[in-house]
Amino acid sequence: MNSPDNKKPILVLKDISLSFKGVKAITDISFNVYEGEICSVIGPNGAGKSSMLNVINGVYIPQEGTITFDGKEFTKMKPHSAAVMGIGRTFQNIALFAGMSVLDNIMSGRNLMMKANFWEHALNIGRAEKEELEHRQAVEEIIEFLGLQSIRKTPVASLAYGLQKRVELGRALAAKPKMLLLDEPMAGMTMEEKLDMSCFIQEINRNYGTTIVLIEHDMGVVMDISDHVVVLDYGKKIGDAAPDEVMNNQDVIDAYLGVSH
C-alpha cells in the first residue's frame, strides 16, 4: 500500500454540496486522494457515497464546490470529458453489452483512444488496421491479466455475475485511466470472488500505477487493501484518515461500524 508522503493529490474535492429538489445528498465534502493510493469510501446506505462518485466523473453537477483532477480545476464536466481526462468508472449495476463477447466488451473501452475515422475503420485501411492491432494487443493483455482467456469469445450475458464484474473492470482498465472509481465492485460476490477481485484491484494499483477510489461495505477488504479511508454519513464527512485511525474513530463507530467491529 502507498503513503501520501511526498505524493501529490491527484484528486481534490473542496466544499462539495449536492442536492435534489432541496434535499441534500452531499454537504460540504472536502478531501484529497493521493496519486497511487487506494482510497476506500465507506458509510451506511444512503450516506451519499455513489452520489459523490457521480459528482467526480460528471454524472451529477454539484451546486457548490470545486473539483481538481490531475491539476485541472472544474465545477462541472460531462462523463465523456472525465473519461478523456483519465477518470475510469464501474457501477453498482453492471452496464455491459450483453450480446457482445468478453473481448468486444473490453475492446469498447479503447474507443476514446482510437484516432482513425469512421471510413478508415469501416474499410480497415490506412492507420485503422495498425490501430486495431495495437488496441487488440492491449486488450488481450488485460484479458490474460484478469484470467478471462478461456471465455474471451463468450457473450457476457451467459457469464456468472462475478465474471461479468471482472469484464466490467477490464473494460474500465482498457481506457488506461489515471484513476478508477469502483462503485461496490465486490457486492453480491462469494468470498472466493471477493478475494480474486481484491487481488486484481491491488495489482492494478501496483502494476499499472492506477489510483483507486472504491466504495465497499466489507470492512475486512477495506482494512486489507486501503491506504486511506473516507467515511460519509447523511451526506457529511465524519472520517478521513488511515484505516486504523478510522476504525478507532468514535463518530465512525457510532454511525457505521458498531461496537462489535
Annotate each predicted stretch with a short phrase.
Residues N2-H261:
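Glycine-rich phosphate-binding loops of nucleotide-dependent enzymes
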